[in-house]
Amino acid sequence: EEGGAGAKRMVEEGVLDRVPAVDWMFGMHLWPSLPTGRVASRPGPIFASSDKFEVEIQGVGGHAAMPHLTVDPVVAAAAAVTALQTVVARNVGPLESGVVSVTQMSGSDTHNIIPAAAKIGGTIRALKDETMEKLRRRVGEVVRGVATAHGCAAEV
């Protein structure tokens, strides 16, 4: 599933070139809330496209006893996570569908060091290509803006 591109592989292997011609094709996906043995469908999209994002926020590390001598990327990353919660609410219309989920965060691996960089990552999901593009763009803009406001830089 994740990155397997099943439909793409089927097309590359010639499934659409066979005789007799394919009239209908259905993609299927597990749906845990549906009872076993049931198949469900409806007109229009059912599942969203998905993309991942990875962010590195660079600051200046140092000892946690002297945070005033650092530019703390962990604080900037935490602020970015909070700010990203507004991306869908303020950029996706009420009749559209989009999700931005931050699912990863990392920084120092010890208790007394402010790291030079912190990382966050997650997924973006949307039913429409134009919504996906808007969300990708806004995630980058928001993260870079928050990083800059904290004196850091960000790579998205």
Residues covered by each model-derived region:
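A non-catalytic, amphipathic alpha-helix used as a structural packing/dimerization or gating element
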Residues: 76-79, 134-142
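A common structural junction motif
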Residues: 87-88, 140-150
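A conserved active-site cap/scaffold subdomain adjacent to cofactor or substrate pockets
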Residues: 111-137
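Histidine/acidic-residue-rich, glycine-tolerant segments that coordinate divalent metal ions
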Residues: 1-115
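Short, polar/charged, Gly/Pro-enriched helix-capping and turn/loop motifs at alpha-helix termini
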Residues: 91-94, 149, 153
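Short gly/pro-enriched beta-turn/loop segments at secondary-structure junctions
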Residues: 50, 115-119, 149-152
